[in-house]
Design a protein with these regions (language model features):
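A glycine/serine/threonine-rich, flexible loop-to-helix segment
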Residues: 198-200, 222, 234-258
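Active-site helix of classical SDR
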Residues: 171, 205, 213
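Amphipathic alpha-helical dimer-interface segment in Rossmann-like NAD(P)H-dependent oxidoreductases
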Residues: 123, 127, 162-182, 191-192, ...
Length: 297
């Protein structure tokens, strides 16, 4: 879908379920998804709203992070992306799309569950770009478990370290380097407000992200830095078929939304662009829901 400007019925703008079953091991690869998600590869057109800014985005090889990386580059920002080494194939595509915009790109393969790696990401971004103006903490782990007894300590630890500990470690490393006017954006979820029974550990972390974001916003506004969260609803990303949902739910993913379909990553990036830009100069400590009509409390 390349036309995002012409007025049209949003219910029919992108594919609707049923979708084919498409199991793949976590963390998954975009190329194996059917239908292919729209990250804005052709659809997103920038307007220099972030010209000269320097951004670090975690989990940017696929899904929402990939769409944000593409959009930021097309808005004029230099972009560093982090991802797991197993996601290199997807990451190479994102790096090529960033570089095609004539801005700097930086690859940061590693595991955010490693505390030291979070500091290293910040250091390498500062070295490559000479500073950091936008931090998007987006990397996430989602693996469904149908019973609390199936959520092992290993599961719980991996999800909390990926989704919540890494947020803290990365903010600790980055905030001393953020100038006045900088922005921190976290990815929360509708799961913070309407938790699914099969996503117990994931939903727990998303609730934590909301409260952490609001608390950090109160600290960092004293430096002139804004901090906000985005809470997505059902979005068609590789997180879902690679263990984030049972395959029977993948088949009808997004059907329960007011639109009768899941959102595409390109549909949420305008919020990330706004929150990173000076146009959101009076916005901090907020959670922006993009939930397909479900709303957030």
């Amino acid at each position: 879908m390349s036309d995002r400007l012409t007025m049209q019925d949003p219910r029919d703008q992108y594919p609707r379920p049923p979708f084919p079953r498409q199991p793949q091991p976590a963390p998954g690869l975009v190329a194996r998804m059917e239908p292919q998600p729209d990250h804005g590869e052709e659809a997103y057109h920038g307007h220099a709203r972030l010209k000269g800014r320097r951004a670090l985005i975690t989990g940017a090889d696929s899904g929402i992070g990939r769409a944000v990386a593409i959009a930021y580059a097309r808005e004029g920002a230099d972009v560093a992306i982090s991802y797991l080494p197993s996601e290199e194939a997807d990451a190479r595509e994102v790096i090529a799309l960033i570089e095609a915009e004539g801005v700097k790109a930086l690859s940061l393969p590693g595991d955010v569950r490693d505390e030291a790696w979070n500091a290293t990401m910040v250091e390498r971004t500062l070295e490559a770009f000479g500073g950091l103006d936008i931090l998007v903490v987006n990397a996430g782990r989602q693996q469904f478990r149908e019973d609390v007894g199936q959520v092992s300590t290993e599961d719980f630890d991996a999800t909390l370290k990926t989704n919540l500990y890494a947020l803290h470690w990365l903010c600790q490393a980055a905030t001393p380097h953020l100038p006045p006017g900088a922005a921190v954006i976290t990815t929360a979820s509708i799961q913070a407000y309407e938790p699914s029974d099969i996503l117990l550990d994931y939903a727990t972390t998303k609730g934590g992200i909301v409260t952490y974001t609001k608390a950090l916003a109160k600290q960092l506004i004293e430096k002139g830095v804004r901090v906000n969260a985005v809470a997505p609803g059902p979005f068609w990303t590789v997180l879902q078929p690679s263990g984030g949902q049972p395959q029977e739910k993948v088949e009808k993913f997004g059907a329960h939304s007011a639109f009768g379909r899941p959102g595409q990553p390109v549909e949420i990036v305008p919020v990330y662009v706004l929150l990173a830009s000076q146009e959101a100069s009076f916005v901090t400590g907020e959670v922006w829901g993009v939930t397909g009509g479900a709303g957030i409390a």
